Design a protein with these regions (language model features):
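Dynamic helix-loop-helix/coil hinge segments at AAA+ ATPase domain boundaries and subdomain interfaces
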Residues: 8-14, 29-30, 60-81
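Interdomain "pre-motor" coupling segment immediately N-terminal to P-loop NTPase/helicase cores
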Residues: 14-65
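Solvent-exposed alpha-helical segments within well-ordered globular domains of core cellular machineries
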Residues: 7, 19-22, 40-41, 71, ...
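Intrinsically disordered, low-complexity and often Lys/Arg-enriched segments
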Residues: 1-7
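Active-site catalytic microenvironments for nucleophilic, acid-base chemistry
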Residues: 45, 121-125, 187
Length: 239
């Protein structure tokens, strides 16, 4: 009977329940539980497994370069790592608002780590996330154009709850790059959240987009206005 129940639960794709049922059977605890308590335990096991599976899938799809977590952060207000601000962002309320987060500071102070940690936190909360180095993002947009898949590419990017763009500002954008970046930002503006990490202070971002002043103004208005800012300073943590 116990084996049949296990197989039935598996055939119904209730593997969390099935494993919990088998554990209860093997530890001889079935007889100690009321029907209500037993059902509650099985349902919780199924819920936990589905949540864990979904989180693992979201983390894999996000393609993070760094395995980072909020718990690993060392807070230091003097260096811009304000505990209250970062823990507030870790609630993912900014994602519900469709707001941007801008993380700036010199090389090695932890920009990518903080951006990635917030991205991981969003996955744990059930949001669809994608991490992308800016140069790789430009290459992906370029290839999508060449392969006549631009519409599909931009639709997929627009559907992400959170897009994490790392190393923004390493090169000046021009031509189609500016148009593509504008389209990416426009599709997400006010609807979906974007985290941008950069060595350049925000006041210098215009220079990266300056080859088309109209686009530069439009992009910065959408990205910077109402954004949450984390401005890091101090010596490199890589030393």
């Amino acid at each position: 009977m116990n084996d049949q129940i296990y197989q039935d639960l598996k055939s119904l794709h209730l593997s969390g329940m099935a494993q919990s049922w088998m554990l209860l059977h093997e530890t001889r605890k079935l007889g100690e539980l009321t029907l209500q308590d037993g059902m509650a335990m099985l349902i919780q096991a199924e819920h936990d497994q589905r949540t864990n599976n979904r989180t693992a899938r979201l983390l894999s799809q996000a393609r993070f370069r760094y395995n980072a977590s909020i718990e690993e952060l060392t807070f230091d207000t003097a260096q811009g790592r304000d505990k209250n601000q970062i823990l507030s962002l870790a609630t993912c309320e900014y994602i519900k608002q469709g707001a941007s987060v801008l993380v700036t500071g010199p090389a090695g102070v932890g920009k990518s780590f903080i951006a990635s940690a917030l991205g991981h936190q969003a996955c744990f909360a059930g949001y669809k996330v994608r991490y992308a180095n800016m140069q790789k993002l430009l290459e992906d947009m370029h290839m999508a154009r060449i392969e006549s898949k631009a519409a599909r590419f931009f639709d997929k990017m627009a559907a992400l709850d959170l897009l994490v763009i790392d190393d923004f500002g390493m090169k000046i954008l021009d031509g189609q790059q500016l148009l593509d970046f504008m389209e990416l930002i426009e599709d997400r503006h006010g609807r979906k959240s974007t985290i941008i990490a950069s060595q350049l202070p925000v006041k210098n971002w215009y220079d990266i987009l300056a080859k088309n002043p109209t686009i530069a103004d439009a992009v910065l208005d959408r990205v910077v206005k109402s954004a949450y800012r984390i401005e890091l300073n101090g010596v490199s943590m890589r030393k």
